């Protein structure tokens, strides 16, 4: 399981990064979600790695 926490603001991000955060379900700063560890989620995290904090 992977825990993903939004730590930086979405303001100023490009639209693709915003859609990725929406798909991850991260809308507010300090919001956390837990996901299964798979390639799809890893790829989404890689797109917004500068905005999130990941713990395994």
From Swiss-Prot:
One of its GO terms (cellular component) is large ribosomal subunit. One of its GO terms (molecular function) is structural constituent of ribosome. It comes from Oleidesulfovibrio alaskensis (strain ATCC BAA-1058 / DSM 17464 / G20) (Desulfovibrio alaskensis). One of its GO terms (biological process) is translation. Part of the 50S ribosomal subunit. The lineage of its organism: Bacteria, Pseudomonadati, Thermodesulfobacteriota, Desulfovibrionia, Desulfovibrionales. This is Large ribosomal subunit protein uL30. The keyword Chaperone does not apply. Belongs to the universal ribosomal protein uL30 family. InterPro entries: Ribo_uL30_ferredoxin-like_sf (IPR036919), Ribosomal_uL30_bac-type (IPR005996), Ribosomal_uL30_ferredoxin-like (IPR016082). It holds the Pfam family Ribosomal_L30. Keywords: Ribonucleoprotein, Ribosomal protein. Gene3D superfamilies: Ribosomal protein L30, ferredoxin-like fold domain (3.30.1390.20).
């Amino acid at each position: 399981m992977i825990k993903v926490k939004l730590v930086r603001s979405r303001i100023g991000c490009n639209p693709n990064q915003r859609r990725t955060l929406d798909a991850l379900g991260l809308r507010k700063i300090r919001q956390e979600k837990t996901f299964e560890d798979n390639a799809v989620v890893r790829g989404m995290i890689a797109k917004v790695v500068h905005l999130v904090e990941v713990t395994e």
